[in-house]
Regions:
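Bacterial N-terminal signal peptides that target proteins for export
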Residues: 1-6
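Catalytic cores of nucleotide-enabled group-transfer and carboxylate-activating enzymes in metabolic
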Residues: 91-96, 128-131
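Short, structured interface segments
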Residues: 143-164
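N-terminal signal peptide c-region/cleavage motif recognized by signal peptidases
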Residues: 13-15
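Vicinal oxygen chelate
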Residues: 35-47, 82-84, 96-122, 141-146, ...
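Core segments of cupin and vicinal oxygen chelate
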Residues: 31-34, 41-89, 133-148, 175-227, ...
């Protein structure tokens, strides 16, 4: 299983036309802490846990929190947990030793917030459904929300604020939604995050979704939580498009891929170029799929 949650890993480390909007949305200000606390959630089998962690650090550099076994859900469960800190983004890795309680495993990321109750209220007011009501964990509180289009994310807060290094590049949450729900998702997330649409391309190259003869709509959003790419498609996607959760930006794509291959990472989509990027898709040991890209300077 791939997808996961960030509940207690910190234990280890102690509009209908929203796409046209170009300014920040009216929001509940001050909820976000910073993009280094936007952690992609990765589930792997316990036997693949160390291989994944080792390969991820070998590819991007960085460091690890202490590994442990915890209960990180509001109902009984047990999982291996560890944070991986890299210059291009943080991941929370989980290897469940028990069945995973519903709906955990369906959320893609965890966002650290300054006030969980305020964040949950703001999410509801912005059109999100709270699918896991706030609950206590040993270091704070957590909730899971679902945005229009079925996009699940965790909101979390800790009694003692963690302190992570500033990232060299901001990872990109990559969200695939249908045309019928895209504007509702964009409008709601902008309202919640106070984000800004920095690009809305109605005819982005289909090579980005494995369909080089077609075009599709791609919306890019930035906020204090981090970066978002909203990929609006009809769902006719060849593998592995849509299976990735995050895009990681590196300064040298070829050098990063060389490190990845030495670490046992499999290239699923060979590097290709678009107007502003060279990109590839890879699969890490344990099954986690990611997009990796370098910005093309023109």
């Amino acid at each position: 299983m791939l997808k996961a949650l960030t509940v207690a890993v910190i234990l280890l480390a102690s509009a209908a036309n929203a796409g046209a909007q170009t300014g920040p949305a009216a929001s509940s200000p001050g909820l976000a802490v910073g993009p280094q606390y936007d952690t992609t959630h990765v589930y792997v089998a316990p036997e693949d846990f160390d291989r994944f962690v080792t390969s991820f650090v070998a590819t991007f550099g960085g460091s690890l929190s202490k590994q442990g076994v915890f209960t990180v859900t509001p109902t009984p469960s047990s999982t291996m947990s560890q944070l991986v800190f890299t210059p291009v983004g943080t991941v929370s890795v989980f290897g469940f030793k028990t069945p995973v309680p519903y709906p955990f495993g369906g959320e893609r990321t965890g966002y650290l917030v300054k006030d969980l109750d305020a964040a949950v209220r703001a999410a509801r007011a912005s059109g999100a459904d709270v699918i896991v009501e706030p609950f206590n964990d040993p270091v704070g509180r957590d909730a899971v929300v679902q945005w229009p289009g079925g996009v699940n994310m965790q909101l979390y807060w800790h009694t003692t604020a963690p302190s992570y290094a500033t990232l060299q590049t901001i990872p990109e949450n990559r969200v695939y939604v249908s045309p019928g729900r895209a504007d509702a998702f964009i409008r709601g997330f902008l309202l919640f995050s106070g984000g800004t649409v920095v690009g809305d391309d109605a005819k982005a190259s289909g090579v980005e979704i494995g369909r080089p003869t077609d075009t599709y709509r791609r919306v890019r959003i930035t906020s204090t939580f981090g970066n978002f790419a909203v990929l609006v498609t009809d769902g006719h996607l060849p593998y592995p498009y849509g299976r990735e959760l995050t895009g990681y930006e590196t300064s040298d794509l070829d050098a990063t891929l060389a490190k990845a291959k030495l670490a046992g990472v499999r290239v699923l989509v060979e590097p290709y170029s678009t107007q502003d990027r060279r990109s590839t898709f890879v699969q890490f040991p344990g099954g986690y799929i990611a997009e990796i890209h370098a910005t093309v300077r023109r």
